[in-house]
């Protein structure tokens, strides 16, 4: 398929192998957006880890200061009482125990995040084959198993993103929408990278943040010059 003049101009704007200041990278992406919907701005971070080694796998979560721009539906497993009330007050769409598990087993899985209190994991554990393949299984490493479900719900709804290294040692994450202000996207990316630095495995050697690239849903990938970010 022949490229349009606009597509050729966008491709020409991205020099292979060149790292761009964050502001320039975002300007390229905003110029490249062409979908009829508001595209997401995503980031890929190549880490200096051996993802084949269990002690070098990086997994965690970050609450993005400017949010993700997405509406998040949350289900919470918590026993009736103060914890359940806390989750509902924080805005959870569904709260329960065995009753909620039965609904999920029957196919009610219209949730983006599932949270559980530690004492509810006996119920959630039975849903491994239902929640696991969808990436919804609660896990303490990403803050979705918590004794404070209200706080966990607020984090999920206010822009918490979860990440883990893939087989190539790369983290993939959304940092906002194409209609976000540049400063908002920059603060989100900075928060994510600072958390990744904190999560650096003790056995990781050499350069840790090897490459940071941003892209839009339908646009090109652009390498970011890390010196244009404040990572201290």
From Swiss-Prot:
Q: Name one GO cellular component term.
A: cytosolic large ribosomal subunit
Q: Which Gene3D superfamilies match?
A: 3.30.190.20, 3.40.50.790
What PROSITE patterns does the record point to? RIBOSOMAL_L1
Coiled-coil segments on the chain, per record: none
Which key words are in the record? Answer: Repressor, Ribonucleoprotein, Ribosomal protein, RNA-binding, rRNA-binding, Translation regulation, tRNA-binding
Superkingdom, taxonomy of origin: Bacteria
Classification via Pfam families: Ribosomal_L1 (PF00687)
What the entry lists under InterPro entries is as follows: Ribosom_uL1_bac-type, Ribosomal_uL1, Ribosomal_uL1-like, Ribosomal_uL1/biogenesis, Ribosomal_uL1_3-a/b-sand, Ribosomal_uL1_CS
**CDD domains tied to this protein:** Ribosomal_L1
Please provide the Gene Ontology terms (biological process) for this protein.
regulation of translation; translation
What are the GO MF terms of this UniProt record?
rRNA binding; structural constituent of ribosome; tRNA binding
Q: How does it assemble?
A: Part of the 50S ribosomal subunit.
What is the stated purpose of this protein?
Binds directly to 23S rRNA. The L1 stalk is quite mobile in the ribosome, and is involved in E site tRNA release. Protein L1 is also a translational repressor protein, it controls the translation of the L11 operon by binding to its mRNA.
UniProt similarity note: Belongs to the universal ribosomal protein uL1 family.
Q: What is this protein called?
A: Large ribosomal subunit protein uL1
Q: Which organism is it from?
A: Stenotrophomonas maltophilia (strain R551-3)
Q: Which gene encodes it?
A: rplA
């Amino acid at each position: 398929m022949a490229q349009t003049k606009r597509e050729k101009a966008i491709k020409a704007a991205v020099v292979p192998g060149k790292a761009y200041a964050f502001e320039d990278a975002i300007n390229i992406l905003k110029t490249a957006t062409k979908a009829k919907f508001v595209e997401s701005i995503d980031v890929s971070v190549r880490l200096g880890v051996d993802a084949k080694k269990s002690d070098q796998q990086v997994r965690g979560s970050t609450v993005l200061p400017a949010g993700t721009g997405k509406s998040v539906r949350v289900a919470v497993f918590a026993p009736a009482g103060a914890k359940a009330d806390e989750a509902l007050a924080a805005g959870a769409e569904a709260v329960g125990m065995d009753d909620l598990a039965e609904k999920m087993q029957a196919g009610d899985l219209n949730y983006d995040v599932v949270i559980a209190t530690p004492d509810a994991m006996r119920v959630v554990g039975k849903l491994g084959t239902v929640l696991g393949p969808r990436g919804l299984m609660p896990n303490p490493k990403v803050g979705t198993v918590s004794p404070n479900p209200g706080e966990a719900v607020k984090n999920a709804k206010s822009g918490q993103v979860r990440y883990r290294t893939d087989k190539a040692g790369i983290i993939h994450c959304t940092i906002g929408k194409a209609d976000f202000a540049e400063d908002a996207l920059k603060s989100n990316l900075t928060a994510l990278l600072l958390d990744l630095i904190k999560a650096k495995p003790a056995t990781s050697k050499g350069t840790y943040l090897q490459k940071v690239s941003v892209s839009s849903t339908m646009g090109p990938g652009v390498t970011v010059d890390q010196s244009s970010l404040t990572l201290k």
